[in-house]
């Protein structure tokens, strides 16, 4: 052990980070009212990982902070999980969300009470391997929960959508501080490996977005980007578009033709549809129908065809 005081201080800071890291994400979701890019599976796995974490620290009789931390972590993860299910693109029914949360709470209470009462006497007798299994399984669930965001990154060429970077930074900071505290403390190799997996996967998310930014945002000047797909689109000023439309309007000519002069286009490019008259804002009557022929909108009156400016 290099420095017990330094290890304890760093572990405490890391624990605090892992208590509050999801608050920025929750606020971010609430403001956007949209969780596109934040996989519900990620939050669900993190909620479930809190159960074995709580059992592990309660059985080993860790300090109060370590026993409270998994429960706070589960609480904030549950809020974010509910948001990811309720907001688009999932938009799950409230009744279904309530049933899922109730099942998680029931499983949490049952497992914690049962395993803590069963394993604590064994731990006091020196049988520690059952408790260690819970600690390892919790860390594995936490790391596996970081896999779904990579599928979201693949959909958008590496761009991070829906994940708040403040949340990601605080969570990564907790992992790195935990690694340093273990190195300065008892040099638990298993702990270093598990914390390193979490830190490495979160670093990969940062790196993915940075690479996307270098490829598309920084190098492709004069382009705009779709928020969902991340596809680059040419940027055109609104004034130029308006000028082009006005020029096009000046070239439009109205024609009064007989019904028999223009044969009906029965191809797949022609279609009848309802629309409001652009001149007076009123709805077209039954005698006035619209017909689209290869992208040209014409208005049919009983005695004439005329092209509309749209």
From Swiss-Prot:
Keywords for the protein's UniProt record, in alphabetical order: Cell membrane, Glycoprotein, Membrane, Phosphoprotein, Repeat, Transmembrane, Transmembrane helix
Entry annotated with the keyword Cell membrane: yes
Span of domain PQ-loop: 5-69, 138-194
Listed transmembrane segments: 7-27, 37-57, 62-82, 97-117, 132-152, 165-185, 192-212
Keyword Phosphoprotein on entry: yes
GO-annotated cellular components: membrane; plasma membrane
Superkingdom, taxonomy of origin: Eukaryota
Post-translational modification Phosphoserine, affected residues: 229
Entry membrane topology: Multi-pass membrane protein
Segments on the Cytoplasmic side according to the record's topology features: 1-6, 58-61, 118-131, 186-191
Subcellular location(s) of the protein: Cell membrane
Glycosylation site list: 251, 259
Topology feature Extracellular, residues: 28-36, 83-96, 153-164, 213-310
Protein name in UniProt: Uncharacterized membrane protein YDR090C
Lineage, broadest ranks: Eukaryota, Fungi, Dikarya, Ascomycota, Saccharomycotina
